[in-house]
Amino acid sequence: MVKLRAMFPRKIKVCDAFGIPVYLDFSLIILLVLFVMDFGSFVYGLSFALALALSIVAHELGHALTARAFGYHTRDITLSLLGGCASLISLPRKAWQEFLTAIAGPAVSFVISGLAWLSLNFLPVEERWTVLVLYYTMWMNFVLGCFNLLPGFPMDGGRVFRSVASVFTTRTKATYIAMIVGRGFAILLALRGLHSIVTGGGWGFISILIAWMIWREGYREYQMARMEESARSWGNDWSARVSPPPYGGDDDEVEIRED
């Protein structure tokens, strides 16, 4: 019997970037199609959709290439409805390595946003299509960078917070603190979403969805940290399955090694 997954794969390979396979999940394909249709103009919609996809790839490459500089390799990058995911084969263990790996993605997004702003203000750009694409790229990458710095898992900000806290305590306790901070933010975000729904504002359901994701992934990350600590106390090798960015992927099997 042929498995349906083999007949209808969840994602397709679109290219290789710096030797890293890049896949496109079908959930994002649907979003990009709706994105194109929503703009009314096929040319503008397609341009903005491509700018979005390329910006996410650049963001994830920031994680992947920084990790590579520390000797940690990336299996692939997958773009999905919830954003990008760089699947690291092994995770950085030192706090400063995790900090730089996590912060690299938002840093790339801010650099792209800054370059788009400089192009708009200091280059002789007059064509309407070029101006709109640059303007959209500027704001899109700025929002992408800020969103990923939110202090909770699975966003980069959660890992940045944990890496800083790890300097003063154990990794497990730092993960717990990051989870609590993230859940506090998730509660505020959920309340904001409920208020938007009641008052007829925008992004209400999206805010609640993000809050739920932060709540769930924070606990999952903490459980992983506890299992890792338990395994190391017995002198066993540790492997885990994770999914939140910047780590994870399709099979989500990751080796965590000690340098």
Write out the residue ranges for each language-model feature.
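Hydrophobic transmembrane alpha-helices and their immediate loop junctions
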Residues: 1-259
